Amino acid sequence: MSESALNTAIQAIARGLPLEESVLEGAFDTLLSGEAAPEEVGAFLAGLTVRGETANELIAGARIMRRHGRSVSVEGPLLDTCGTGGLPWKSLNTSTASAIVIAAAGGRVAKHGNRSVPPKTGSADVLEALGLQLELSDTAFKSCLEIAGVGFLFARSYHSAMRHVAPIRHKLGIRTIFNLLGPLSNPAGAEYSVLGVYDKQWVTPMAEALKALGTRCAWVVHGLAGIDEISISGPTDVCEVTPASIRHFQITPSDAGLPSHPLSTLEGGAPEENTAAIRDLLDGREGPFRDIVLINAAAGLHVSGMVADLPAGVQRAAQAIDSGAARETLNTLVRTSRESD
């Protein structure tokens, strides 16, 4: 049935027809089982991209991606801070730095991420440069979470089925639905998240997908300056997701009691540059990177129910940095990742 489901899906996409849930799940199952021919993978992914993916397609894809992935069972509430990537410029690793700060402020963070394509630096690239052991057993991940308050889930280790579509994605050279599915597929099942998207058009569909997938509370965000995180350079579109509703609003840096900074002040580079920026941040350096980390960490603390609003979150995040707790959290995370197992 799965092979015919993929063919059915390709034909429906070509004709502009909606796809039934069973067909969608069968199509994704074929892709991630390695049963699809390269031309079928390309036709399906390119067709969805050209037509524009829907929330239902995101939901079906995430369900099958989770089913094919390796999961880790963790008790208690977990937060993920992640973004879709796909930005046209080299950025600093805001969500990674925010995860460390949130953990230092008392949160529990299951940070899901991957490498990026050079010259950009992904969360895995910068954490490895900071000394983290990326390939962790479930026991080692849990130790990091228990001892440091944050653990890293290396996407390549948990979603090995992606190897079946990776060559075609690379050859296509365009964003595909899998750029959106990764942030929806946290291996630890984090029920809280701050999820950044690279384009405003994905804010609502990703929010609808998170709601359907059982999220307890999340913010899907797009910085209107063109970034997949809460912006310190202008307004940010937000969809707040709870089991009962999806609420749309905008926030600005001033809502968190922070100044604005030009986007150009936040440009990153190679892992060494981004690593230095994180170390400087944790050593107390003030400036644009600190402020964008503060507002994104504040959102994570708020989504997790730890603070009432963004200003309170900024204050708590700043205390975590200025007290040295965030620096110690990073050191503990790195040490634990290397000592476990």
From Swiss-Prot:
Cofactor note (record): Binds 2 magnesium ions per monomer.
Residues that bind anthranilate 2: 169
Gene Ontology CC terms: cytosol
Single GO MF annotation: anthranilate phosphoribosyltransferase activity
Binding-site residues, anthranilate 1: 83, 114
UniProt keyword terms in alphabetical order: Amino-acid biosynthesis, Aromatic amino acid biosynthesis, Glycosyltransferase, Magnesium, Metal-binding, Transferase, Tryptophan biosynthesis
Reactions the enzyme catalyzes: N-(5-phospho-beta-D-ribosyl)anthranilate + diphosphate = 5-phospho-alpha-D-ribose 1-diphosphate + anthranilate
EC number: 2.4.2.18
Cofactors: Mg(2+)
Enzyme class: transferase
Pathway(s) of this molecule: Amino-acid biosynthesis; L-tryptophan biosynthesis; L-tryptophan from chorismate: step 2/5
Binding site for Mg(2+) 1: 95, 229
Sites where the protein binds 5-phospho-alpha-D-ribose 1-diphosphate: 83, 91, 93-96, 111-115, 123
Quaternary structure, from the entry: Homodimer.
NCBIfam families: trpD
Family classification: Belongs to the anthranilate phosphoribosyltransferase family.
HAMAP family: TrpD
Protein name: Anthranilate phosphoribosyltransferase
